[in-house]
């Protein structure tokens, strides 16, 4: 934040219930226990989770994270790509089974003419993108626009239904897990995704500061980089 960079994560989906991005209100995140920036979606998700509890089952969900204020050029074109580093960090979180940046998997069904982010000259006289399908990355580096990523979490494996398993003797058994278990773990992981994204961006920023010899010389001479 001291560099003008903000990292914000929130729940964008609980099971089949998804937020409406056109009606997003980030101030709504702290007003519900699911950390969803959509009041209507949060209410629907709460109802859906009540149904999960009654059915002794669980569901997964999606956490979206946006990074604003990140300057262009953070990352590397090959070995330390920004999107690859973020993918490694986010996929290291327990229960994460999928990761995407920008349009992600939806881009696979798009045409090049639909997915390409066109550039224009903005009001400040500098080049800017009309769209952000790439999610703020280009060639492994940040492009100066909002960085958008999503992490897919699997359903909580600890459910109260009777399930089949095999014991240590190789015999088929049935197992019934006792105790209280969350029907979804996504809300608990929002702050984890946010922290992992922030740590990764900070790490790459430090690497960027020492990526060129002239920058290193300025650092040791205590000059402004």
Regions found by a protein language model. Give the residues of each.
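Flexible, glycine/charged-enriched surface loops at secondary-structure junctions
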Residues: 3-11, 52-63, 95-107, 208-219
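Glycine-rich loops and low-complexity Gly/Arg-rich segments
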Residues: 32-36, 88-92, 123-126, 173-177, ...
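Electropositive phosphate-/nucleotide-binding environments in soluble metabolic enzymes
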Residues: 35-43, 76, 80, 84, ...
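Internal helix-turn-beta structural module
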Residues: 158-225
């Amino acid at each position: 934040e001291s560099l003008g960079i903000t990292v914000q994560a929130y729940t964008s989906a609980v099971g089949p219930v998804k937020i409406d991005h056109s009606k997003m209100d980030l101030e709504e995140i702290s007003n519900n226990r699911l950390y969803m920036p959509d009041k209507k979606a949060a209410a629907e998700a709460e109802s859906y989770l009540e149904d999960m509890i009654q059915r002794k089952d669980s569901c997964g969900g999606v956490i979206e994270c946006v990074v604003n204020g990140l300057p262009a050029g953070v990352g590397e074109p090959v070995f330390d790509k920004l999107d690859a580093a973020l993918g490694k960090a986010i996929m290291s979180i327990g229960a994460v089974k999928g990761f995407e940046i920008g349009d992600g998997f939806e881009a696979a069904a798009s045409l090049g003419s639909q997915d390409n982010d066109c550039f224009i000259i903005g009001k400040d006289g500098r080049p800017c993108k009309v769209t952000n399908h790439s999610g703020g990355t280009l060639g492994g580096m940040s492009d100066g626009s909002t960085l958008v990523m999503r992490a897919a979490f699997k359903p909580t494996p600890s459910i109260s239904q009777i399930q089949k398993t095999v014991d240590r003797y190789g015999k088929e058994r049935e197992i019934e897990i006792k105790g209280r278990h969350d029907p979804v773990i996504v809300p608990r992981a929002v702050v984890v995704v946010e922290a992992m994204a922030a740590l990764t961006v900070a790490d790459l920023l430090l690497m960027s500061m020492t990526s060129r010899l002239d920058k290193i010389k300025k650092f040791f001479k205590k000059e402004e980089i």
